[in-house]
Amino acid sequence: MDTLFNSTEKNARGIPQAPFIENVNEIIKDPSDFELCFNKFQERLSKYKFMQESKLATIKQLKTRIPDLENTLKICQSLRNHSDEGDESDEPILLHYQLNDTLYTKAQVDIPEDRADLKVGLWLGADVMLEYPIDEAIELLKKKLADSEQSLTVSTEDVEFLRENITTMEVNCARLYNWDVQRRQDLKQAQEGTKNLKI
């Protein structure tokens, strides 16, 4: 039975493939091993469910983060494009931006004459904000956006893989449980049959 869980089949992130039980009698040779076997299957099932919950939380976080990165990138590109146009008027840019889900506000941005002086402040997380030249900020945002989209793709693939394995393990647990119920019924009938024998 231990060889059943030592499968070398794994997905790209190392999550092991769930075994499928076709014949319970091949797995459980001795009925006294049922509890151990059933507990191992239940344990693996709970591990898959935990991994799935973790991946779903990651997906939720990424689905919130990606639009924020896209909006920030769009604003930075807009600032750079405005400074590239070389607008001769020294009028500041008037921007409308989102503070939170339901609140928007306006900002007035003065564009420096030298584009090299154009800098933006980016929140990096954990209450840290750094000032970057506009070109570096755009490159950083593009990289973070690409990484986040890649992580979303990977996490979505993992959730689908885990969903399939959870279903397989639930079927395995049901087969084991039904096998044990049938074994107990057969044992009970055999005992009742021996009681009725008259010698």
From Swiss-Prot:
**An example of a Gene Ontology BP annotation on this entry?**
tubulin complex assembly
The keyword Chaperone is assigned to this record: yes
Q: List the GO molecular function terms.
A: tubulin binding
What is one term from the GO cellular component aspect held by the record? prefoldin complex
Which residues, renumbered to this chain, carry the PTM N-acetylmethionine?
M1
Database matches in Pfam families: Prefoldin (PF02996)
Question: Known SUPFAM superfamilies for this protein?
Answer: Prefoldin
**Acetylation recorded as keyword:** yes
Q: Which CDD domains match?
A: Prefoldin_3
UniProt keywords (A-Z) are: Acetylation, Chaperone
Sequence similarity: Belongs to the prefoldin subunit alpha family.
Q: What else is known?
A: Present with 6550 molecules/cell in log phase SD medium.
Role description: Binds specifically to cytosolic chaperonin (c-CPN) and transfers target proteins to it. Binds to nascent polypeptide chain and promotes folding in an environment in which there are many competing pathways for nonnative proteins.
Query: Subunit structure, briefly?
Result: Heterohexamer of two PFD-alpha type and four PFD-beta type subunits.
Protein name (database record): Prefoldin subunit 3
Q: What species was this sequence derived from?
A: Saccharomyces cerevisiae (strain ATCC 204508 / S288c) (Baker's yeast)
Q: What taxonomic classification does the UniProt entry list for its organism?
A: Eukaryota, Fungi, Dikarya, Ascomycota, Saccharomycotina
